[in-house]
From Swiss-Prot:
Record note on quaternary structure: Complex I is composed of 45 different subunits. Interacts with CARD15, but not with CARD4. Interacts with STAT3, but not with STAT1, STAT2 and STAT5A. Interacts with OLFM4.
One GO term (biological process): apoptotic process
Protein species of origin: Bos taurus (Bovine)
Role this protein plays: Accessory subunit of the mitochondrial membrane respiratory chain NADH dehydrogenase (Complex I), that is believed not to be involved in catalysis. Complex I functions in the transfer of electrons from NADH to the respiratory chain. The immediate electron acceptor for the enzyme is believed to be ubiquinone. Involved in the interferon/all-trans-retinoic acid (IFN/RA) induced cell death. This apoptotic activity is inhibited by interaction with viral IRF1. Prevents the transactivation of STAT3 target genes.
Pfam families: GRIM-19
Location in or out of the cell: Mitochondrion inner membrane; Nucleus
The name this protein goes by in its record: NADH dehydrogenase [ubiquinone] 1 alpha subcomplex subunit 13
Transmembrane segments: 30-51
Signal peptide: none
Length: 144
């Protein structure tokens, strides 16, 4: 059998025309320099506003410290009153518990000094309920 001839596609005579491969986008938006300038301006504005807020925050912090310093003697006096009240209640409880022990001196200091020694937590809350000890040690807790 005779092989059939295949006709091959060829370019047109004279070749194909020029192909437009460039993107023709309209020029729009800011130039690179102007975008850089806007970015620097935004950065400077951010630094300026942050500097202003830091100054205001420092002023508020100083005001809080001054208020805390002004209230410190009152808070210390309240704490001292509470401690002395608890020590008095502890002495009364010690007197009732140790009344039958011969030679026991109620309120005798365990320290051999005449100076004031701030009582420890165990000394203050030794005769208290465990809920009160937990509340004094850890503050308010839900699970007790």
């Amino acid at each position: 059998m005779a092989a059939s001839k295949v006709k091959q596609d060829m370019p047109p005579v004279g070749g194909y025309g020029p192909i437009d491969y460039k993107r023709n986008l309209p020029r729009r938006g800011l130039s690179g320099y102007s975008m850089f300038a806007v970015g620097i301006g935004a950065l400077l504005f951010g630094y300026w506003s942050m500097m202003k807020w830091n100054r205001e925050r420092r002023r508020l912090q100083i005001e809080d410290f001054e208020a805390r310093i002004a209230l410190m003697p009152l808070l210390q006096a309240e704490k001292d009153r509470r401690v002395l009240q608890m020590l008095r209640e502890n002495l009364e409880e010690e007197a009732t518990v140790m009344k039958d022990v011969p030679g026991w001196k109620v309120g005798e200091s365990v320290f051999h000094t005449t100076r004031w020694v701030t009582p420890m937590m165990g000394e203050l809350y030794g005769l208290r309920a465990s809920e009160e000890v937990l509340s004094a040690t850890y503050g308010f807790i839900w699970y007790t």
